[in-house]
């Protein structure tokens, strides 16, 4: 019998991330590189570790191999525990065949046995594909104080973007009175961050109810949360005011990387009180040639810079040869940039080779971002 836990986290990491195009052709979205030396999933796992959440189930599905290898037993995040720790939970086969996760609620439902062994009071449900730093223990305290059945973390988004999110309409006490999934005409700009705390008994009851409904799409936002509201359960919105970015598109991923280069940013990766942990490869120090120029950039281990790099993020093992310029760009691990190349407002994928004399920049709209990548 597993040791009883007050709160167990379930991290949804099976997303395909189709809007990231070639970056996720052979890679799960949470495993996409970010910020010079991280993967997207590092932020959620580090938040768990820093918040004192010691038991984390990671639900994987799409292209899971590299993600599984990266997570390992969770030691990079101090989550390799005798009791609890990290457990990877892919779909599994029953006598009737393999049961794929058909939605966010389906994924948790198929792992109720995993949760039951810990007899938790609360279950924290997370997404593995957002960039943010958050103390989940404060949200749990809020949930308990408000005597809520479900608490949902929300953040104010620009009104012109509200129709892209699940929107919470609340009363003055922040109790949720209506949930609208991507409304055409939103009445609030409080967007769901995809972070939920459920009382365990409520979660179990309503997931079992949802699984019995043949018309359900087995999704929290579309099915489970509206049902809870219809039945009068208490749902509270937990306001979050820090940095949060949904990096589901090429442009938003680029923007989040560029945010790291700003003088004033709430996403401080050097915060000693809230470290973001990662699995770092062993690479030699970066080499910057005498004639090279580097300005306002993150240059990581193993890079060889002989050209000019300005306001860019370069991952480990990147080469920029003589005469080349990299401006306002993200260059992922192992990419080789030849001589006299110009790269501007672009993301260059892992292990890409950019031939001598190539020019890469937006052709039509100067606000666009170019993606140069291919599946492995």
Curated annotation (Swiss-Prot):
BP GO terms, sorted: glycogen biosynthetic process
Role noted for this protein: Involved in the biosynthesis of ADP-glucose, a building block required for the elongation reactions to produce glycogen. Catalyzes the reaction between ATP and alpha-D-glucose 1-phosphate (G1P) to produce pyrophosphate and ADP-Glc.
Identification of the protein by name: Glucose-1-phosphate adenylyltransferase
Keyword 4Fe-4S assigned: no
GO MF term set: ATP binding; glucose-1-phosphate adenylyltransferase activity
Enzyme Commission (EC) number: 2.7.7.27
Subunit (UniProt): Homotetramer.
Residues involved in alpha-D-glucose 1-phosphate binding: 101, 166, 181-182, 192
Pathway of action: Glycan biosynthesis; glycogen biosynthesis
Coiled coil location: none
Family the UniProt entry places it in: Belongs to the bacterial/plant glucose-1-phosphate adenylyltransferase family.
Catalysed reaction equations from the record: alpha-D-glucose 1-phosphate + ATP + H(+) = ADP-alpha-D-glucose + diphosphate
InterPro entries documented for this protein: ADP-Glc_PPase, ADP_Glu_pyroP_CS, GlgC_bac, GlmU/GlgC-like_hexapep, NTP_transferase_dom, Nucleotide-diphossugar_trans, Trimer_LpxA-like_sf
Pfam families on file: Hexapep_GlmU, NTP_transferase
Organism: Bacillus cereus (strain ATCC 14579 / DSM 31 / CCUG 7414 / JCM 2152 / NBRC 15305 / NCIMB 9373 / NCTC 2599 / NRRL B-3711)
Keywords: ATP-binding, Carbohydrate metabolism, Glycogen biosynthesis, Glycogen metabolism, Nucleotide-binding, Nucleotidyltransferase, Transferase
